[in-house]
Amino acid sequence: MNSYMGERMGIPRDEIPRLREKYFREYGTTLRGLQAKHNVDVQDFLAYVHDLPLQDYLHPDPIQQKVLASLPTRNLIFTNADAPHARRVLRQLQIEEYFVDIVDVNRVDPHCKPSREAFQIALNIAGESDPSKCAMTDDLPHTTRAAKDFGLYAILYGSAVPSHFGAAALSPDMDAAFNDWSQLPALLNGSHS
């Protein structure tokens, strides 16, 4: 994103971090802020920022694969990226077969996670009217907080999970949290879905 903003848009490098933070706070994503304030072409932006050698960053995780294969749930990807990038990521991780649909930034346009409108669109696409029957896993606390406020069973995953946070502990930001994929089935069994 920094390269796009500097090279394609001519924004001075020293202004980029401040603008990214401002747009993220005000619009939910840097992209939505760039759309609102700079009339950026969404497809050009997405193509540029997603042109990455995923194999250098992402590697299949056998535990993640095993857990996802064991889930009796209908799984969707809900992302602020576009569907082609999400598919590339799923293929790289070798987990594409475990997801039935992708709700991407284009399908929720002009909204994005973590807005209520985006959650409602995703819920409609999932074919569910009751958010309490759905769980959402995300790696950002502000997204899990919004998901929980919307009525979803919100699960925080990854490096944002505080080390002292037990899997069953409650927080205003989430209903549950995990760092190890093998913990996910137990968390889903504890959900109200």
Name every feature range the model reports, one short phrase each.
Residues I63-T73:
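A short, Lys/Arg-enriched amphipathic alpha-helix followed by its capping loop at the start of a domain
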Residues M1-Q65, P84-R87:
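N-terminal helical cap/lid subdomain that shapes the substrate entry/recognition surface
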Residues A69, L76-F78, D82-A83, R87-S193:
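Asp-based, Mg2+/Mn2+-dependent phosphohydrolase catalytic module
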